[in-house]
Amino acid sequence: MTSVGGGPRTPIRPAWRRLHPLDAIAVALAVAGAGCVATGLLPRADATATLTRILPLLLFLGTVVVLAELTAAAGVFDVLATRLAVVSRGSWPALFALCVGFAALTTVVLNLDTTAVLLTPVMLALAVTLRTAVAPLAVTTVWLANTASLLLPVSNLTNLLAADRVGLDPLAYAGVMWLPQLAALAVTTVLLWYFWWRRDRPATGRFAPPEVHRPADPVLYRTALVACLLFVAGILAGAPVGLASAAAAALLLLGFALRFPGTLRPALLPWRLLVFVTGLFLVVQTIGQHGLDDLVAWLAGRDGGAPGALRAGGTGALLANLVNNLPAYLAVEAVLPAGDRQRLFALLIGTNVGPLALPWASLATLLWLERCRAAGVAVPLARYLLTSAALAVLGTLAAIGTLLLTS
């Protein structure tokens, strides 16, 4: 939980020379996507339209990850996590409530991948510092990385796609999704406590609060806080999300360039994620034009009202757990009528809250597993899969139910 070398810690992101299986998947998708265009399986005009659509999304993804990485390097997450433990005054239930709120807020504001990649190591280290069970804090991060990702367009890439399709600004989008988000959070909180925190609490029900983490560079720490607030203010003011994240990242990059330029490396940019997303869009669009759309349209059906919303959300959740939530969203979105907002938002719930039953259903879950393995943490697998499947079903149904009540 401490910085090293007298300055901010170096952002944790694997270099290209250390290839990870996800690197190979990203490159394979990019090559496959380029091959689809080169061979004519995907017409160039369609590919150009797709790339034009996702360019603002790629700008957001690239800059928000840089913002999150440098925010972590400045010690913001470490400081906040230890302060949560201090504020809880040794109370296990109080720590639970504060950790749930912290993970949910991180997901809502800085997106689910930030929670999975950057908050997970902090929570794991906090558990070691407190000498408590690691599993409750680990599961809190991955569950809320997924189920807290409904409220704002920036919380999840699928949200950005949906908001762009229906033409909603962030506040209007939040006006639709705030009740479904509350429902998903309520179910998550109850299941987290019952299956994980209640069972693994300390024998005395209390723990010894740690000392507050001191950032290595207070100036960079304050700069990171200002950059995050600037990002949130830009979103609330209605600025394009890519521009808001780029401006905030630029401010923090300037701070690091002036004080610790050695921290800035090309590996800060999430090359793997950008390549993965670009290739995935092209490949899914190609498969859709060659038969997938017909199958997905049959699964999603044409029903309206509650049956249609439940079927769209269920199809999204099913396909997400079979493959992954991003291609699942793209495949179902392609067969929904342009003006069918209710089923689109139900699909969004299914592909955001539903991808928990299996580890590969969400990129955030894969990234979380990677961080847990790097820290030598093994979450009880059978218990995790069973409880995650329960959350996927109950959380999705609760969120879609509230959507139907308010739309």
Please report, for each region that a protein language model flagged, where it lies by residue.
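Short, amphipathic, aromatic/basic-enriched membrane-interface segments that mark the entry/exit
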Residues: 32, 82-92, 108-110, 209-220, ...
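Helix-loop-helix module between adjacent transmembrane segments
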Residues: 68-69, 102-111, 144-151, 180-188, ...
